[in-house]
Design a protein with these regions (language model features):
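The Walker A/P-loop phosphate-binding site
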Residues: 2-110, 122-132
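Small/polar loops that bind or transfer phosphate-bearing groups
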Residues: 88, 115, 151
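Short acidic-hydrophobic, aromatic-tinged amphipathic segments that line or gate anion-handling sites
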Residues: 110-118
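Phosphate-binding/switch loop-helix module in NTP-utilizing enzymes
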Residues: 118-156
Length: 156
């Protein structure tokens, strides 16, 4: 006869085996508007919320559909308006400063870090390094940070 499955023991073993892993739910408390009420509703179920901070959100669509405009323009601007620092990773080398300024994005070093990367491994290493440093900070000293990758498809 097989032993009964013990979820408590399984959970304990699993969370101890992977450094930095946590269990449970992490419901978002902060939201960044997409600049479009209908899209906010589709993403979050609320006309005023939009993209949840602390979660991965992917915008996919045909070339020219407006993904860069929504993400690099509207969402970055809304994040900055909320005091959130933005790391903008540009894999197409297509996001120029004049275009971002036209969208009212603040490109100063205190508000935005724009990185040009063409390899997914570089992006993974950058985010991994950031997360290690971020977790080492005292929780009340951690700034709110938004990562935007334009375009993920070019990295794959």
């Amino acid at each position: 006869m097989a032993k009964a499955f013990d979820p408590t023991k399984f959970r304990t073993q699993l969370t101890k085996s992977i450094t930095g892993m946590s269990a449970g739910f992490n419901d978002p408390t902060d939201w960044i508007s997409t600049g479009n009420y209908a899209l906010n509703y589709l993403v979050s179920g609320d006309f005023h919320k939009g993209v949840p901070l602390g979660k991965v959100t992917v915008f996919a669509g045909e070339s020219g559909a407006g993904k860069s405009y929504i993400c690099a323009g509207n969402i970055v601007k809304a994040a900055q308006d909320q005091g959130i620092f933005v790391v903008l990773i540009d894999s197409e080398n297509a996001l120029d400063e004049a275009w971002l300024h036209a969208l009212d994005v603040d490109t100063s070093e205190s508000k935005l870090l724009k990185l040009n990367m063409s390899m997914i491994d570089d992006v993974a290493k950058t985010i991994s390094t950031f997360m290690a440093d971020y977790k080492a900070m005292e929780e009340d000293e951690r700034p709110k940070v938004l990562f935007v990758i334009d375009s993920l498809g070019m990295l794959l």
